[in-house]
């Protein structure tokens, strides 16, 4: 036995960052213009643009999906509820009522292993719109909260 010998070992640890899929920005508030964009349904467009930014830096990327849910129907401070009034309209004109069940609003493509930033926006007659089924009370403001879910 040789007690004077000190053994040194070098160990290399490689940490690989596999990237991430992130929801970076979402328009925080938007309002609706009360002039209908549809003859047969009372659909109203947003006053301001709804823009969502998603960054995909995943090394092994795959298609991803963005869903929207609401915590409750549009409601005024006085408790007046506009049932089934927040809707999502896709590029084919198909209408889905927003609820606590996730509604698919966008499908993103794989990034091919490279950083990809996707800016999501919709035309005036697409995306999140206001559908009037009941009458509106004068001088009332209606609110609901949209939750966005990003899924790989």
Q: Where are the regions that the model predicts?
A:
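N-terminal small/polar-rich segments of proteins
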Residues: 3-89, 109-152
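Carboxylate/His-rich catalytic cores and anion/metal-binding grooves
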Residues: 85, 94-96
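Extended, solvent-exposed, non-transmembrane regions
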Residues: 96-108, 112-115
């Amino acid at each position: 036995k040789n007690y004077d010998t000190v053994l040194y070992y070098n160990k290399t640890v490689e940490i690989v960052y596999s990237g991430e899929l992130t929801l970076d920005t979402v328009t925080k508030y938007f309002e609706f213009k009360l002039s209908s964009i549809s003859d047969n349904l009372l659909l109203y467009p947003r006053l301001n643009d709804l823009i969502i930014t998603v960054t995909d830096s995943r090394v092994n990327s795959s298609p991803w999906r963005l869903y929207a849910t609401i915590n409750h129907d549009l409601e005024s401070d006085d408790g007046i509820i506009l049932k089934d009034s927040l809707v999502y309209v896709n590029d084919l004109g198909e209408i889905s009522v927003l609820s606590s069940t996730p509604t698919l609003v966008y499908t993103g493509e794989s990034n091919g292993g490279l950083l990809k930033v996707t800016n999501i926006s919709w035309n005036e007659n697409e995306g999140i719109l206001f559908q009037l089924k009941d009458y509106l009370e004068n001088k009332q403001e209606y609110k609901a909260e949209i939750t966005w879910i990003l899924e790989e």
